[in-house]
C-alpha cells in the first residue's frame, strides 16, 4: 500500500480532517491550532504532549509529501495548513462523508469496534444505524484502491471485533473472518466521550470568539 504514515503524521492528518468538518470557521489551522488539536485530551488515543517544533516537523514532512498544503496571504498574518490527504482537487483518494468520519476516528484513536466508531464519529457524520457503519467499513476494506481498513481478530471475552486503518502499513493483528456482526451501542464510556468532545469544541469556539472580540 502506498500510504505509510507514522503515528505522528497520522495524528496531524486526523486532526486536520476532524477540524475541517467540526469547526470549519477555524479551518485551515495555524501551527498553534494543530498543536492544540494534536494534544487534545478528548477523542485522542493516546493523549499526546507534542511541542510546536515537533508538530512543525510533521507539517513540513507532510507538505513535502503533498498530503498538506500551506495557505497564506489575503490578510492571513500566519501560515495555515489544510489537508490534501483526501478529496482534494488533484488527489487520487476520494472518500464519502461517512468514510472520512470513520477514517478520521481511526487515525485519531486507533483500533475500535463499530459501536465505538459510530459514537465517536458522530460529530463528523451521523450514521443512521449500525448497519450503515458496518457497510461503510466493509466498503473501505474491499475498495479496489485499498484496502483502507482491516477487521482484527476478536479479543478473548469481547463481543465485538475491532477495526484498524491501514494508512500506517499492515497491522500486526491478523484479520478475523469477514462476516459482520451486529453491535449494540450501549457503552456509557463512549457517550461520555462524545459529550466531552462537544464541550471541548464549544470551549474552543468560545475562546476564538473572545479572541476576536479582544482584537
UniProtKB/Swiss-Prot annotation:
Q: Pfam families recorded for this chain? A: DUF480 (PF04337)
Gene expressing this chain: yceH
Q: Name its species.
A: Shigella flexneri
Q: Which HAMAP family match?
A: UPF0502
Q: Which InterPro entries match?
A: DUF480, WH-like_DNA-bd_sf, WH_DNA-bd_sf
Supply the alphabetized keyword list: Acetylation
Q: Which residues carry this modification: N6-acetyllysine?
A: 80
What is the name attached to this protein's record?
UPF0502 protein YceH
Family matches, as Gene3D superfamilies: Winged helix-like DNA-binding domain superfamily/Winged helix DNA-binding domain
Q: Report the sequence similarity comment from the record.
A: Belongs to the UPF0502 family.
Q: Does the keyword Acetylation apply?
A: yes
Amino acid at each position: 500500500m502506498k500510504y505509510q504514515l507514522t503515528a505522528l503524521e497520522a495524528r496531524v492528518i486526523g486532526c486536520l480532517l476532524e477540524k475541517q468538518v467540526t469547526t470549519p470557521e477555524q479551518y485551515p489551522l495555524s501551527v498553534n491550532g494543530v498543536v492544540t488539536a494534536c494534544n487534545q485530551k478528548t477523542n485522542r488515543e493516546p493523549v499526546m504532549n507534542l511541542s510546536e517544533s515537533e508538530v512543525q516537523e510533521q507539517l513540513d514532512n507532510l507538505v513535502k509529501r503533498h498530503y498538506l498544503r500551506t495557505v497564506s496571504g489575503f490578510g492571513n498574518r500566519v501560515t495555515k495548513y489544510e489537508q490534501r490527504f483526501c478529496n482534494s482537487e488533484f488527489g487520487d483518494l476520494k472518500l464519502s462523508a461517512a468514510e472520512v468520519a470513520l477514517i478520521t476516528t481511526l487515525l485519531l484513536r486507533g483500533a475500535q469496534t463499530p459501536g465505538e466508531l459510530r459514537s465517536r464519529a458522530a460529530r463528523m457524520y451521523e450514521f443512521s444505524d449500525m448497519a450503515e457503519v458496518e457497510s461503510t467499513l466493509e466498503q473501505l476494506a474491499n475498495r479496489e484502491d485499498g484496502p483502507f481498513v482491516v477487521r482484527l481478530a476478536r479479543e478473548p471475552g469481547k463481543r465485538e471485533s475491532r477495526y484498524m486503518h491501514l494508512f500506517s502499513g499492515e497491522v500486526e493483528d491478523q484479520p478475523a473472518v469477514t462476516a459482520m456482526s451486529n453491535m449494540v451501542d450501549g457503552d456509557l464510556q463512549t457517550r461520555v466521550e462524545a459529550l466531552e468532545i462537544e464541550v471541548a469544541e464549544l470551549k474552543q469556539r468560545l475562546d476564538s470568539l473572545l479572541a476576536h472580540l479582544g482584537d
